[in-house]
Amino acid sequence: VTSAGRGGNVLYLNDGHGVFHKATDALPTEGNSGSRVVAADMDGDGDLDLFVGSRSVPWKYGVDPVSMLLRNDGKGHFTDVTAQLAPELARVGMVTDAVWQDVDGDNRPDLVVVGEWMPITVFHNAGGARLTKMKTRGLEQSSGWWNRIIAGDFNGDGRIDFVVGNLGNEGSLTAVV
């Protein structure tokens, strides 16, 4: 998936021989251009669904754009299910990055979203039936100019950790190289 600017997003499919072709009817035509696209099987049906996060509305910087949750029908066609499954996600903020990761140990991918002038936001996945914004130990107060999030077991304790990049000195932790 790539951004087509004011024209929305475009999906390119591999033909199995290393050649990518534009899938003209795969994605919804409405919506802003995506700044970050992340895939996961959010509903447990065996195919990859998409979160398309948007950072800006053309010519209206600072206005929260529309981000989308797209369900894959298994044949490469995606339907916008944001209003039904995750209405709080539609205008979550100016998204710069996101990651699907099980944060609560239920073996379902939850969605963690970061962006400009917004808090780190976690959406709990209730088995693909609904994604709801979690109230999580002070993250509601984490507003910043977030630009990157990476998940991994960085300290070797067997649990997922997150490294989040922020421009500025608002945080309580500072990385020194």
Question: For each predicted feature, which ranges?
Answer:
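Hydrophobic beta-strand segments that make up the repeating blades of beta-propeller
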Residues: 1-4, 50-54, 111-115, 162-166
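Flexible loop residues that form catalytic
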Residues: 4-5, 42, 55-56, 103, ...
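Short, solvent-exposed loop/turn segments at conserved positions within beta-propeller repeat blades
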Residues: 4-7, 59-65, 115-118, 174-177
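Short coil/loop residues immediately preceding or within conserved phosphate-binding loops
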Residues: 6, 34, 64, 93-95, ...
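Hydrophobic beta-strand positions in blades of beta-propellers and related beta-sheet-rich domains
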Residues: 9-11, 50, 67-69, 120-122, ...
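Blade-edge motifs of beta-propeller repeat domains
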Residues: 12-32, 70-93, 123-144, 176
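Beta-propeller blade termini
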Residues: 13, 26, 33-44, 48, ...
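Conserved, well-structured beta-alpha core segment at the onset of a catalytic domain
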Residues: 133-177
